[in-house]
Amino acid sequence: TQWSSSAASDVYKRQGMRYGEPSLGEALKKMKENNVSKIIVLPLYPQSGSPTTSTTYDEISNILKNWTWVPDLVFVSGYHDNQDYINALAKTIKQSFKNNGMPDKILFSYHGMPKRYLENGDPYYCFCHKTTRLVAEKLKLNKEKFDMSFQSRFGTEEWLKPYTDDMLLDYGKNKIKNIHVISPGFSVDCLETLE
């Protein structure tokens, strides 16, 4: 649902970060100080998963468990297939095509996670595939025009595949030079989308 501008201006908004500042605890404290009675938690992970969205919920629960003031809580678990999100991605990508031309390949690159999460039933991998499919359909891309991959792995454990760096090396070996890398799992640009 969409809010009118007047309704949105009446909403007390705070950002809190799971691994940065301001922290989730600081954001919740500000809400308490402002007598907020209902909190909508919107983690900025479009494709929810246990290492991302679930840890955010756990952290908020851990903070609130010792408080005597507990507001109504609504958790938004993800929006990987939300039509507004898909439309926004498609619009941004179309603008990139307009500004930079149509690439030879489009690579949808998502943040990776250890493969064991998928093997244990975590839906993240499937959500990434669904987002990719919906955006590709919206853009009317044929299947040969795009691929999907995962970035940002570390350690020795096997992570979700294919890996973005391996895909880019393969493109180079196959003389595919004009590539657009799309990062639909990141709501805003950050170190992992810019580097």
Model-predicted segments: where are they?
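Hydrophobic alpha-helical segments within soluble ligand-binding/sensing domains
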Residues: Q83-D104
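Glycine/proline-rich loop-helix segments at beta-alpha junctions forming the active-site rim
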Residues: K30-G49, Y57, E157, K161-E195
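Long, hydrophobic, well-ordered secondary-structure blocks that form the structural core
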Residues: R14-A88
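Single conserved hydrophobic/aromatic residue that forms the stacking wall/gate
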Residues: T1-A8, Y12
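Short, surface-exposed alpha-helical segments at coil->helix boundaries
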Residues: T53-S61, Y125-R133, E195
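Short catalytic/ligand-binding loop motif for oxyanion handling, primarily in non-cytosolic enzymes
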Residues: S23, Q47-T52, Q83, P114-L118, ...
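Short helix-capping segments at alpha-helix termini
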Residues: D10, L64-V70, K138-K143
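Redox- and metal-dependent alpha/beta enzyme cores, enriched for Fe-S-associated oxidoreductases
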Residues: M102, K115-D147, R153-P162, M167-L168, ...
